[in-house]
Amino acid sequence: MAPKAAEKKPSTGGKAPAGGKAPAEKKEAGKKTAASGEKKKRTKARKETYSSYIYKVLKQVHPDTGISNRAMSILNSFVNDIFERVATEASKLAAYNKKSTISSREIQTSVRLILPGELAKHAVSEGTKAVTKYSSSAK
């Protein structure tokens, strides 16, 4: 174990480190040890994407068409961006109406505000259809 900052002896070289500060102690960042002293295997951070859902929709619309990784990444970013915009707008609408819960009504209104014209109409109708299907299957 390295000595603590207070226990370190002053260097005899006469030069101070760059910046005038003593070097910070380095902590061993990726090495987590179990109580018995064994190294734990570090689990990879999970990155959730919409890739599988985008692929399923693509195969429904164009069964013989593929998609590159770059195109999938762009579509995934697009879905994340739209999701964030709708969620932010719905949150604002709920706050304006002094409500702490975002309902399907706030989502629908935020979609109408964010998406232009015909696209908003189609999105609202598909959303309503999905909510109806979910409600009927949940019973």
From Swiss-Prot:
Can you tell me which residues the record assigns to a coiled coil? none
Give the Low complexity compositional bias ranges: 11-22
Q: Tell where it localizes.
A: Nucleus; Chromosome
Primary place of residence? nucleus
Entry keyword set: Acetylation, Chromosome, DNA-binding, Isopeptide bond, Nucleosome core, Nucleus, Ubl conjugation
Which regions are flagged for Basic and acidic residues bias? 1-10
Annotated cross-link Glycyl lysine isopeptide (Lys-Gly) (interchain with G-Cter in SUMO) - which positions?
A: K8, K9, K26, K27
Would the keyword Transcription be found if you checked this record's keyword annotation? Answer: no
For the cross-link Glycyl lysine isopeptide (Lys-Gly) (interchain with G-Cter in ubiquitin), list the residue numbers. Answer: K133
Q: Which GO terms describe its cellular component?
A: nucleosome; nucleus
| Binding partners and assembly | The nucleosome is a histone octamer containing two molecules each of H2A, H2B, H3 and H4 assembled in one H3-H4 heterotetramer and two H2A-H2B heterodimers. The octamer wraps approximately 147 bp of DNA.
The task this protein performs is described as: Core component of nucleosome. Nucleosomes wrap and compact DNA into chromatin, limiting DNA accessibility to the cellular machineries which require DNA as a template. Histones thereby play a central role in transcription regulation, DNA repair, DNA replication and chromosomal stability. DNA accessibility is regulated via a complex set of post-translational modifications of histones, also called histone code, and nucleosome remodeling.
Tell me what this protein is called. Histone H2B
Gene source species: Coccidioides immitis (strain RS) (Valley fever fungus)
- Which gene produces this protein? HTB1
